[in-house]
């Protein structure tokens, strides 16, 4: 996953300009408070949440959910292999600039757009949030990180391991619905009921 410097989902307009903007609740949710308090890197050895998690997409309307804070919208949450996670947990570093085996990526929707070789549109300005701390179990993820523009970002979510496994075995390598749901905070903005689909990547 280290080589995938930019996720442009193969569904066409999953992470583009259209779509409903998720409403932000500025009162701190209990989940957000939990995420802000964690430290270090911990992981259940049985946990297998590897993959990209992208905002829920409606196949009938071709519209994806938008989880927005200021000019930035969530593009994806990525979790790498057990091997990469184990190596990172020993040193706290990946050895690759601007990369960690658990991270979030946001797009600046006010930035210019470009088009890749598949004809898909992407934003030229993105920001990755690398972890200051995380806790991973077989069905939960708690994450805290810091971005140069966005500041402190946390996510606390509940995963559906059966749904993730089914998506991995599906021909399209994408889940039929949300398999990771939770609360995202970006600075003072708290976004509840975040719904993310699993995507296997290109």
Outline where the language-model segments fall.
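Small/flexible residues
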Residues: 6-8, 28, 45, 70
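Short, low-complexity, disordered segments immediately C-terminal to signal peptides
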Residues: 26-39
